[in-house]
């Protein structure tokens, strides 16, 4: 796999879970002998939802809820077969979405 690159994008609502997962991936890649770039923090996506507090009237009384989606990018340069095998066996939390390209 010489000259190739694996790009891993991580998404999660919890920044501690995504940082721990990124740290675990980087440690695994370095241990297997490939070089790694990252984790690069990408812009956090913030969704704000406005909800009327009252079920009937009082439209001026509203409540705001937000969801933040944290994202990280990790590039693995010149991965070895050992690196790919170790990445397939790594155990990450269910709250972290992993996209491998």
From Swiss-Prot:
InterPro entries linked to this entry: Ribosomal_uS10 (IPR001848), Ribosomal_uS10_CS (IPR018268), Ribosomal_uS10_dom (IPR027486), Ribosomal_uS10_dom_sf (IPR036838)
UniProt entry keywords in alphabetical sequence: Ribonucleoprotein, Ribosomal protein
One GO cellular component, as annotated: peptidoglycan-based cell wall
Recorded GO MF terms: structural constituent of ribosome; tRNA binding
Cross-referenced SMART domains: Ribosomal_S10
Record family assignment: Belongs to the universal ribosomal protein uS10 family.
PANTHER family (alphabetical): 30S RIBOSOMAL PROTEIN S10 FAMILY MEMBER (PTHR11700)
Subunit: Part of the 30S ribosomal subunit.
Name assigned to this protein: Small ribosomal subunit protein uS10
Organism lineage: Bacteria, Bacillati, Actinomycetota, Actinomycetes, Mycobacteriales
């Amino acid at each position: 796999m010489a000259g190739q690159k694996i790009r891993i994008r991580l998404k999660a609502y919890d920044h501690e879970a995504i940082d721990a997962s990124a740290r675990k991936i980087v440690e695994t890649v370095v241990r297997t002998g490939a070089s790694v770039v990252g984790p690069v923090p990408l812009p956090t996506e913030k969704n704000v939802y406005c909800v009327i507090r009252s079920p009937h009237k009082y439209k001026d009384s509203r409540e705001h809820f937000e969801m933040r989606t944290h994202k990280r990018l990790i590039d693995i340069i010149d991965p070895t077969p050992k690196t790919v095998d170790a990445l397939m066996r790594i155990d990450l939390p269910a709250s972290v979405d992993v996209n491998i390209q």
